[in-house]
Amino acid sequence: MIRPLEVDFKRYIRDIPDFPTKGILFRDITPLLQEGPVFRSAIQALAHRHHGSLPDAVVAIESRGLIVGAALAYELGVGVVPVRKKGKLPHKTYQATYTLEYGTDSLEIHQDALTQGARVLLVDDLLATGGTMGATIQLIERCGAQIIELAFLIELTGLKGRERLTPHPVISLVQY
């Protein structure tokens, strides 16, 4: 395992005002993804902490979390389990609903995606209020798996998502 480079990841995250709606400042990770050595360093920084005790799987949340999670699973040499929006998975699923500013949404995981007691690392691109990750935690608990960490590229600390996800350990590479 190569030790991750020291990188200022914020330099590779673009701010897009008023996207997707007016008043929202969108943190765009596509510049980070497009810069191969920087993307690799971000994945290695998230992976480095787990090389002594690998998870059984990485659980990755749609949509940008799937990009990060698949790369992280590959780096760790473990499988990746997708958590997707309702109706996107073809087999029997568990479902969890969570609240958004403007309503509710649902996430799903295949019922046979994880074995009882599996140790899993949950990954998404950004932690805001914790709603999406909270719903994912419900799905993982329903599968009977054990959460070892919640990993994010970006954390919006003012929205206090980390506090809502207690007692699970949270790691983020960049904080705003």
In which residue ranges do the predicted regions lie?
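PRPP-associated nucleotide enzymes
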Residues: 1-176
